[in-house]
């Protein structure tokens, strides 16, 4: 599992811009893609957060939660502003966090109140893509990072 901190050490500029884009609207909001039980993709809006240098999400009982509990694979893509259409995406696997102390620290830093119905997952950062461009520029200038060179 690759934490946000490990990703940030390996690719500091991509991580810095990625964090900026995740938090561009204040709270870290993005689109989460998961893999359904039948293998088809599913996409959902979600709040995420980088807390203690790890990427987390709290999930209520839902299709996205079931997908992550059953399969774990995910992709996360930031929202885009048409006036400044930079983009950032990561993909990897979600891991359920059972440690009560970690859950309490993450909940304290979260943008909304969570209770016991929420499942906490850490999102491993195994691949990241940053696309930078002005509103009138095409194509974007992409930078990529992967935990393995073949990705």
Task: Briefly describe each language-model feature range.
Residues 61-62, 71-77, 102-113:
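Short acidic (Asp/Glu) patches
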Residues 1-13, 84-151:
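Charged, gly/pro-rich active-site loop segments
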Residues 61-64, 126:
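A generic "binding-loop/recognition-motif" signal
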């Amino acid at each position: 599992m690759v934490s946000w901190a490990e990703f940030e050490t390996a690719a500091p500029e991509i991580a810095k811009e990625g964090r900026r884009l995740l938090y561009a609207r204040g709270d870290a909001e993005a689109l989460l893609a998961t893999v359904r039980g039948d293998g088809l993709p599913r996409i959902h809006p979600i709040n995420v957060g980088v807390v203690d240098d790890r990427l987390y999400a709290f999930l209520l009982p839902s299709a996205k939660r079931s997908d992550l509990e059953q399969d774990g694979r995910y992709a996360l893509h930031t929202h885009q502003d048409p006036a400044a259409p930079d983009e950032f995406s990561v993909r990897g696997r979600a891991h359920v966090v059972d440690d009560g102390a970690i859950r309490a620290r993450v909940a304290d830093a979260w943008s909304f109140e969570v209770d016991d119905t929420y499942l906490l997952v850490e999102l491993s950062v195994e691949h990241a893509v940053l696309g930078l461009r002005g509103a009138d520029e095409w194509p974007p200038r992409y930078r990529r990072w992967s935990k393995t060179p073949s990705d």
